Amino acid sequence: MPLVCLTDFREHAREHLSKSTWDFIEGGADDCCTRDENMAAFKKIRLRPRYLKDVSKVDMRTTIQGAEISAPICIAPTGFHRLAWPDGEMSTARAAQAASICYITSTYASCSLEDIVAAAPRGLRWFQLYVHPNRQINKQMIQKVESLGFKALVITVDVPKVGNRRNDITNQVDLMKKLLLKDLGSPEMGNVMPYFQMSPIDPSICWEDLSWFQSMTRLPIILKGILTKEDAELAVKHNVHGIIVSNHGGRQLDEVPASIDALTEVVAAVKGKVEVYLDGGIRTGNDVLKALALGAKCVFVGRPILWGLAYKGEHGVKEVLDILKNEFHTSMTLTGCRSVAEINQDLIQFSRL
């Protein structure tokens, strides 16, 4: 039986992955309130379609940081893709390249960056950085991703400490042993990934540190994990190039707002000075449309990509992306939007919010 929506991929992954792997992918912090609210919040939003418009041609293309993508649906950084499929991030990168979208590679990738790039040399790729306490290690990693052709540096800011994920504690998940990570050398050998993956994330990083990162790279810097207008204003003040509104998929601090509920606050605060993106809770084309109508330039998808990997590797990820893109095309057509530029707040029934 074919899988026709992202929920189908979720159920397939739940049935076929080991319990510890499923718990790791699906888990949220504490009571998982925020994880679940990320999806539920979208369903509270109603659309205001416009009709009798010529929608015989609908163009989903847009740009992020100046690069064109086929649709405003890209791949969020998630770690350890080999948990879901043997080729891991290489399969993910190939699917993203085939779909002409951006893939943000995680610090916690289970394939070497060289192998990921070689698998999809023409793909648009950004790199997500967890800040290491050792500045020299950060510097080497930034230089490495620049040399490999990554086009942006995404700094995750919402993990000064790893959230309390009860399933991982219960399962005593030891990802390093389970994955048997290979291709990991020393910094002298040009691969610093294991030093990130086996060390704590720097809890001391603050706004003033951003200037150091900016001095280390010419890449645009995107901050991932912003949820408030205060932090959005500070991000603009410190000259970042973009913000990903995110609560880490509900895996960090529980009982914070759903990403879509925080989006309008952040969009209003930046006043168009930087691009704003969203991750968290995207499961349908309508979800994508709602996020764009509320001001997101693009959305990033996390868990569904791993579900696609678990189904059929590269081809499973491509199927997930194709379903989302086809649904989004339908949503645009049925609301009278002929281009992404025509998607705006007029589509949202604010009296319900």
Swiss-Prot record:
E.C. number(s) listed in UniProt: 1.1.3.15
Question: Is this entry keyworded Oxidoreductase?
Answer: yes
Task: List the GO terms this entry assigns under cellular component, sorted alphabetically.
Answer: peroxisomal matrix
> Which cofactors, by name?
FMN
Q: Has the keyword Cytoplasm been applied to this entry?
A: no
**TM region positions:** none
Q: Where in the cell is it found?
A: Peroxisome
Broad class of enzyme this protein falls into: oxidoreductase
Indicate the residues that form the catalytic site: 248
**Pathway(s) where this gene product acts:** Lipid metabolism; fatty acid metabolism
Please list the GO terms describing molecular function: (S)-2-hydroxy-acid oxidase activity; FMN binding
This protein's assembly is summarised as:
Homotetramer.
Q: Which family is this protein grouped under?
A: Belongs to the FMN-dependent alpha-hydroxy acid dehydrogenase family.
Q: Which reaction does this chain catalyze?
A: a (2S)-2-hydroxycarboxylate + O2 = a 2-oxocarboxylate + H2O2; 2-hydroxyhexadecanoate + O2 = 2-oxohexadecanoate + H2O2; 2-hydroxyoctanoate + O2 = 2-oxooctanoate + H2O2
Entry protein name: 2-Hydroxyacid oxidase 2
Binding positions (a 2-oxocarboxylate)? 130, 165, 251
Domain (FMN hydroxy acid dehydrogenase) ranges = 2-353
The free-text function statement in the UniProt record for this protein reads:
Oxidase that catalyzes the oxidation of medium and long chain hydroxyacids such as 2-hydroxyhexadecanoate and 2-hydroxyoctanoate, to the correspondong 2-oxoacids. Its role in the oxidation of 2-hydroxy fatty acids may contribute to the general pathway of fatty acid alpha-oxidation. Active in vitro with the artificial electron acceptor 2,6-dichlorophenolindophenol (DCIP), but O2 is believed to be the physiological electron acceptor, leading to the production of H2O2.
